[in-house]
Regions:
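ABC ATPase "signature
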Residues: 239-243, 251, 522-526
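Conserved ABC ATPase "signature" region
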Residues: 81, 133-152, 418-435, 544-545
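Conserved ABC ATPase signature
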Residues: 156-161, 165, 440-444, 448
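Conserved ABC transporter NBD signature motif
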Residues: 69-81, 359-367, 379
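ABC ATPase NBD coupling module
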Residues: 82-99, 117, 125, 247-252, ...
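Helix-to-loop junction immediately C-terminal to a conserved catalytic motif
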Residues: 61, 65, 351
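Conserved catalytic motifs of ABC-family nucleotide-binding domains
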Residues: 178, 461
Length: 573
C-alpha cells in the first residue's frame, strides 16, 4: 500500500481513494483520507469507534445515507470514480466487482427466505440462467467455505444456523460472483475466538485462490497485522499512520498507533497481574514475581460437582456437568469457554438465578443450597455482577446517581444522606466526575457506562464481583482503561473476581487461575501460566491457537497443531 499522487503510475491499483472527505450536514467526520489497494492485496482500516473507518467503507460501497452525507475527493475502482458515477451505471458493479461482508450476519440475511433462495440472487450476477446450474455452483461454494452438508444449509433458514455458519454463508454469497474487491466490516467481531480464526483463515485462503482484493475494517490491531498486507490507522476521521502491516505493528511512529499496540493483550500477557505484584512488593519493601506472592487464605467461592439440566425441544440438555472450581480471597479466577460451554449457566447458578440439580455452591463461606429466598438475597449482597454490555445493562430512563444507589436501597444500607455520600465516593473511586450522577446513560461513552456498572456493583462493598465479559463491547483502549480500573479496585479493596470470557489472551492478563469449559464440563484448570505454557487438552490448545499473532512476522504456533486444527473445525459446527 502506498499513498498515490496524480502523477504516479497506478495501473496495478484496483482501488484508489484520494483526498476523501465526508460530512454529515456541517459536521465533518472524515478528513482528506488517501490510500490505495493493489490487485490481490489486503489492506486494513483500523481505528476505534468514531475513527471514520466504517464511514469510509460506506463511501467505497456507495452506502452513505442519501441526502444526509456528502463526500468529496475521489474513490476510483479500476480507474472509474464511483463517487460521481450515476446509480444506473454503478448498480452493475455491486456484487460483480464490489462485494460486501457486513458485521452482523444475522441481520444481513432475510429471516423468512432459505439460504438457497438468497444465494440464487448472488448466482444470478454470474449471468447463469439455468436454475440447476446455479444450484450446483451454490452448493460448490458452500462446500468451499467449509460448511458441513451444503445441501442441508441450502434448504435452511438463517435462524437454523449458528453465527459462525451464517458468516460462512455470507462469505460464500459474497465470493460467488468473483468480485474484484471485498469490503469486510468487522466480519468476526460477534464470533467466538476459534470460529473467528476459522473464518479469517478461510477468507484469506479464498482471497488468495481467487485473486480477490480485501478492504478489512477492524478495531483490532493484532487481527489487522496478522491478516492484512498494509494498514491505515485512523483517528477522528484522519490518517494517523500507514504502511506495511509488519512495519506499523512492529515499530509504530505515532503516539496513537503506539497506544493501540500497547493495548494488544497478546503483547503484554502479565500487564494487570504484574500491577498487583508490584504494589505488594512496594508495601513489602522489595520486588517479587507473580509466582512468589504469598498464598491466598480462604475461599470466597467454592463450586463442587454442580450439574444443571434444561429442557429444550422435548429433550433434556445437560448444560453444566459436574463443574467444580474455587476462587481464593483477593484472587482472580477465569471461566473460559465459547458459546454453549456452560459458563453463563455456571454464573447464573452462582448468583442464585438458577438452582442446581446437584452439587454444592458456597459464597463467602455460606452454602447457597437449601436456603430461603431471603437468605440467598443476603448472600447476594456479598456477590455482585458486572454485565457484558454497558449499553443494555443500565436503565436508560434513570440518572446515574439512582442507578448506582439502587443496590443500597434494595439492601437498606444507611440513611438517605449516607447512601448519597457513598454514591459520590464510589463514582469518584471509579474515576467518574461528580456531575455524572445527574446524567442519563445515553449521555455517556461506552467506557463511562461500564464504569457506572462497576460503581453499581461496588457500592454495597461486596466480597466477590462476577465480571461477565466486561470489556467485550468496548474498543481496545477503553477496554484497557476498564481493566486498569478493575485491577486498581482489587488492589485497594481486596476484591475477589470471577472473570468470565471467551478470550484467553485477555484472561492471561488479568487472572491468576483459570477453568476451561467445553460443553458443560471443565476440560482443564490450573494456574494461568501452566495453562498457557503447558496446555494438556486439545480444546485448550485450540483456544490458544486462535489468539491473534503477537508479532506478524513470527507465526504463533503451538504444539500439536494438527489436533488443534481438528478441534477448531469442530468448534465451528
Amino acid at each position: 500500500m502506498s499513498l498515490k499522487t496524480k502523477d504516479t503510475d497506478v495501473s496495478a491499483d484496483l482501488l484508489i481513494v484520494q483526498g476523501l472527505s465526508i460530512a454529515y450536514g456541517s459536521a465533518a467526520v472524515v478528513h482528506d483520507v488517501s490510500f490505495s489497494v493493489a490487485k490481490g492485496e489486503s489492506l486494513a482500516l483500523i481505528g476505534e469507534s468514531g475513527s471514520g473507518k466504517s464511514t469510509i467503507a460506506k463511501a467505497v460501497l456507495r452506502l452513505l445515507p442519501h441526502g444526509e452525507a456528502s463526500a468529496t475527493g475521489r474513490v476510483a475502482l479500476n480507474g472509474t470514480d464511483i463517487l460521481t458515477l450515476p446509480e444506473k451505471q454503478f448498480r452493475p458493479l455491486r456484487g460483480r466487482e464490489l462485494g460486501f461482508i457486513p458485521q452482523d450476519p444475522a441481520s444481513a440475511l432475510n429471516p423468512v427466505r432459505t439460504i438457497g433462495a438468497q444465494a440464487h440472487e448472488a448466482a444470478a450476477l454470474l449471468g447463469e440462467t439455468d436454475p440447476a446450474v446455479r444450484r450446483t455452483k451454490i452448493l460448490d461454494i458452500l462446500e468451499q467455505v467449509g460448511l458441513p452438508d451444503p445441501a442441508r444449509v441450502y434448504d435452511s433458514y438463517p435462524h437454523q444456523l449458528s453465527g459462525g455458519m451464517l458468516q460462512r454463508v455470507l462469505i460464500a454469497l459474497t465470493v460467488l460472483p468473483r468480485p474484484a474487491l471485498i469490503v469486510a466490516d468487522e466480519p468476526t467481531s460477534a464470533l467466538d475466538v476459534t470460529v473467528q480464526k476459522l473464518i479469517l483463515d478461510m477468507l484469506t485462503d479464498l482471497r488468495r485462490e481467487l485473486d480477490i482484493s480485501l478492504l478489512l475494517i477492524t478495531h483490532d490491531l493484532a487481527i489487522a497485522a496478522e491478516r492484512a498486507d498494509s494498514l491505515v490507522v485512523l483517528k477522528d476521521g484522519a490518517v494517523q499512520e500507514s504502511g506495511a502491516s509488519r512495519d506499523v505493528f512492529a515499530a509504530p511512529t505515532t503516539e496513537y498507533a503506539r497506544s493501540l499496540q500497547a493495548d494488544v493483550p497478546a503483547l503484554h500477557p502479565d500487564r494487570y497481574r504484574n500491577q498487583r505484584v508490584t504494589l505488594k512488593a512496594a508495601h513489602d519493601g522489595g520486588s517479587r514475581t507473580a509466582a512468589a506472592l504469598p498464598p491466598a487464605v480462604g475461599r470466597q467461592i467454592d463450586v463442587q460437582g454442580v450439574t444443571k439440566h434444561f429442557s429444550a425441544g422435548g429433550k433434556e440438555v445437560l448444560a453444566v456437568d459436574g463443574v467444580s472450581f474455587s476462587v481464593e480471597r483477593g484472587r482472580t479466577h477465569a471461566l473460559v469457554g465459547e458459546s454453549g460451554s456452560g459458563k453463563t449457566t455456571a454464573v447464573r447458578l452462582l448468583l442464585g438465578l438458577e438452582q442446581p440439580d446437584g452439587g454444592d455452591i458456597t459464597v463467602a463461606g455460606q452454602s447457597t443450597s437449601g436456603r430461603s429466598r431471603a437468605d440467598v438475597r443476603e448472600i447476594r449482597r456479598h456477590l455482585q455482577l458486572v454485565y457484558q454490555n454497558p449499553f443494555t445493562s443500565l436503565d436508560p430512563t434513570w440518572r446515574v446517581g439512582r442507578i448506582v444507589r439502587e443496590p443500597l436501597d434494595q439492601f437498606g444500607v444507611g440513611t438517605k444522606a449516607e447512601r448519597s455520600q457513598r454514591v459520590r465516593e464510589t463514582l469518584e473511586a471509579v474515576g467518574l466526575p461528580a456531575d455524572v450522577a445527574s446524567r442519563r446513560p445515553a449521555h455517556l461513552s461506552g467506557g463511562q457506562r461500564q464504569r457506572v456498572a462497576i460503581a453499581r456493583a461496588l457500592v454495597v462493598r461486596p466480597d466477590v464481583v462476577v465480571l461477565d465479559e466486561p470489556t467485550s463491547a468496548l474498543d481496545v483502549s477503553v477496554q484497557a482503561g476498564i481493566l486498569e480500573l478493575l485491577s486498581k479496585m482489587q488492589r485497594e479493596l481486596g476484591l475477589t473476581y470471577l472473570f468470565v470470557s471467551h478470550d484467553l489472551a485477555l484472561v492471561r492478563q488479568v487472572a491468576d487461575t483459570v477453568s476451561v469449559l467445553r460443553r458443560g464440563q471443565v476440560v482443564e484448570d490450573g494456574p494461568v501460566e501452566d495453562i498457557f505454557h503447558r496446555p494438556q487438552h486439545p480444546y485448550t490448545r485450540a483456544l490458544l491457537d486462535a489468539i491473534p499473532l503477537a508479532t506478524p512476522s513470527v507465526p504463533a504456533k503451538h504444539e500439536d497443531d494438527e489436533t488443534a486444527s481438528k478441534q477448531l473445525a469442530k468448534a465451528s459446527s
